[in-house]
Amino acid sequence: MADGNTRFTVDEALVAMGFGKFQIYVLAYAGMGWVAEAMEMMLLSFVGPAVQSLWNLSARQESLITSVVFAGMLIGAYSWGIVSDKHGRRKGFIITAVVTFVAGFLSAFSPNYMWLIILRCLVGLGLGGGPVLASWYLEFIPAPSRGTWMVVFSAFWTVGTIFEASLAWLVMPRLGWRWLLAFSSVPSSLLLLFYRWTSESPRYLILQGRKAEALAILEKIARMNKTQLPPGVLSSELETELEENKNIPTENTHLLKAGESGEAVAVSKIVLKADKEPGFSLLALLSPTLMKRTLLLWVVFFGNAFAYYGVVLLTTELNNSHNRCYPTEKQLRNSNDVNYRDVFIASFAEFPGLLISAAMVDRLGRKASMASMLFTCCIFLLPLLSHQSPFITTVLLFGGRICISAAFTVVYIYAPEIYPTAVRTTGVGVGSSVGRIGGILCPLVAVGLVHGCHQTIAVLLFEVVILVSGICVCLFPFETSGRDLTDSISASKEPPSASV
């Protein structure tokens, strides 16, 4: 047995064991959840127009079908984040899988518009648990390869969007939208089927003082990866910090830099309370230690969601509006198959987006990757301020989707990294909730304004939101590439030399 004074943290254990068979299983499970969410989101591009013609809905009623999903996600992302920080990651994502599958399957039997709205809102409530799965997966990944493997995880979203576009192309013309809804709920059921083989996050367990359980899971990882744990005793990051600082009462008491004593005691109580009781984690997100990164992240999540789903909806809406808003032009759209083709082609834009983010995320860092992609997306959308041909429109939206999907991929890597384990899923969940507000407003612009032949105003709004998001990325306090994840809020202060 190693010297009892030798200690190792979860991060050190994960680095020592490397990325192996255990992480592949975790990736497959979390990836299936990401496929499920992507499919449920992408089908909105097809179901809305289908029920609009079936039930004679107005443009506002059609856009509401998408907006209520985001409204449900707004509530769900916050709620499931709190649940998973308080009761564990596994309990958080199993509840969301049940809600998503049941509501998604039942929505195929909606007898009228109101029932469809209610059930799709419940689907959104379940889909709000997506950040819990992402955080759970992240907490098993060794720091040196975290960026690359998070991009691989994001590839499952791309697989889901392409699979949904293919499924819609095959199912909609023959069987209709109800069958599409039923088939799209299948991936969520697989999460229920394989749930019993999942493991709780060792980071969460050790933060709760359940060291024996955390150690058992780390030993399981070592066995499956055919490696060994570091010598010594498993220790939490907070214990290590307190041990190192036990002879420095000023910093240990205040948990803040010198000169902030006026509010130090109050803040330290919030921080320590959040470390022990996740119910206080929302308050901790707005403490001086985390406030700047939290507010900036909210803006970036809003902008990414608003732009991403906007580009998805514009792929069908802009080309459909050409004949309506420019009646003197040659009628180019003769069948609904063209819409399926456009969405199918546009979905493939996410593959180069993934490749770009994979190439940039560890080399250039998270911040530079996000900012460059957001600003480039602005350039692609700029010509759409005026009317373009359907071909040029599709090409520009293809380029815009490459960029915004790359930016969205990186923000889902960066967001969990800037928060400690004590508030990670709450922080990402609340940020994702703010992003859902962007999703709620997005159809009002991409569908409502475009239907009203206000393409210039719609595209201008997207340009402004994306530009502001890019600026906020530049203002993030530090880079996370290659850094260890922190567990306690008190250990998550900005590094002395934050990279820009």
UniProtKB/Swiss-Prot annotation:
Q: Which residues lie on this side of the membrane: Extracellular?
A: 45-62, 119-120, 172-174, 315-341, 388-401, 451-456
Residues that bind ATP, according to the entry? Answer: Y137, L138, E139, F140, I141, P142, A143, P144
Cellular component (GO) terms are: plasma membrane
How is it placed in the membrane, per its record?
Answer: Multi-pass membrane protein
Q: In which tissues is it expressed?
A: Expressed in pollen.
Q: Where in the cell is it found?
A: Membrane
MF term (GO), any = N-methylnicotinate transmembrane transporter activity
Keywords of this entry = ATP-binding, Glycoprotein, Ion transport, Membrane, Nucleotide-binding, Transmembrane, Transmembrane helix, Transport
SUPFAM superfamilies (UniProt xref): MFS general substrate transporter (SSF103473)
Biological process (GO) annotations held by this record are: monoatomic ion transport; N-methylnicotinate transport; nicotinate transport
Ion transport: present as a keyword of the record?
Answer: yes
Q: Which residues lie on this side of the membrane: Cytoplasmic?
A: 1-23, 84-97, 142-150, 196-293, 363-367, 423-429, 478-500
Point out the glycosylated residues in this chain: N56, N319
Transmembrane segments annotated in the record for this chain: 24-44, 63-83, 98-118, 121-141, 151-171, 175-195, 294-314, 342-362, 368-387, 402-422, 430-450, 457-477
Family indicated by similarity:
Belongs to the major facilitator (TC 2.A.1) superfamily. Organic cation transporter (TC 2.A.1.19) family.
Q: What does this protein do?
A: High affinity carnitine transporter involved in the active cellular uptake of carnitine. Also transports organic cations.
The identity of this protein, by name, is Organic cation/carnitine transporter 7
Recorded source organism is: Arabidopsis thaliana (Mouse-ear cress)
Q: Which gene encodes it?
A: OCT7
